[in-house]
């Protein structure tokens, strides 16, 4: 086996998604996700995600590294702690995080996700 480099600049058709109705708090956010890589164990994923403005509840069953390319987002945990990120920001949302994700301006990010399979 000769593993190849995964180039995120290669065109890839994204999948349109949106938050579940019971998770939505504000707006009508529309997401596009393009998953460029899944490892053989199906526990590690990497790709590109974009969203229009809106706010929804989140409960992370995975750990996610995010690198925001464009736009502004705000994450808030259940205790009320708040983090705002703009272009160029990198951050990790750890497994078990609960709170809200708000897109203030249309945004795009690269993501790398690890989710343990049982």
Give the ranges of each region predicted by the language model.
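Short histidine-centered beta-strand/loop micro-motifs
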Residues: 35-36, 46-48, 56-60, 77, ...
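Short hydrophobic/aromatic-rich beta-strand segments that constitute the beta-sheet cores
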Residues: 58, 75, 109-111
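Ligand-binding loop in jelly-roll beta-barrel domains
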Residues: 95-118
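Short, conserved beta-strand element in jelly-roll/cupin
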Residues: 60-75
